[in-house]
Amino acid sequence: MRPLDRKIYLASKSPRRRELLRQIGVEFELLMLRNDTVRGPDVTEDAYEGESPADYVARVANEKAEFAWNMVHQRRMKIRPVLAADTTVTIDGEILGKPGSQAEAIAMLEKLSGRTHQVLTSVAVHFTDLSEQFTQVSDVRFAKLSAASIKAYCATSEPYDKAGG
């Protein structure tokens, strides 16, 4: 009997997700979905009109997992579970994605400063004919940030790879 392959595919660019899996001892192979020539219009990170933040983050995580699962089959890769996740920040009903510019990052952080917002993370796992998904919502209270500290932070590379900066 062959030993069970305990490795998974991680369909995420997030350095934080990779670090979390390493911390708990999960072996993974990274699947890059962005800039992939087979990636079609099946995964959009744009929120649909009227889509709630919870529905949005769950849909994106599920679409990433489904796309990655299909990619594994198309490329005839070893069959392993595929894990995908998405995180978004919401305040006043507005979904805040990753800032695309320094001005956008500053505006997001000014909006969050001194207020409570929600961070939603949805995780989706696809394997053979099984699919599992869950979403976690956390309330986060930001301290009041000075304009100088926001500007200094936004001058680094830190805010540009995460929702809400």
Language-model-detected regions and their locations in the chain:
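A short small-residue
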Residues: D36-Y48
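Anionic-ligand binding patches
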Residues: R2-R6, R22, A47-G165
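Cofactor-binding loop segments of dinucleotide-utilizing enzymes, especially the Rossmann-like FAD-
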Residues: K13, L33, T128
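N-terminal beta1-alpha1 ligand-phosphate binding loop
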Residues: R2-E27
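A short beta-strand-loop structural module common to alpha/beta enzyme folds
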Residues: E27-R39
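Surface-exposed, flexible loop/turn segments at secondary-structure boundaries
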Residues: R16, D36-V38, S131
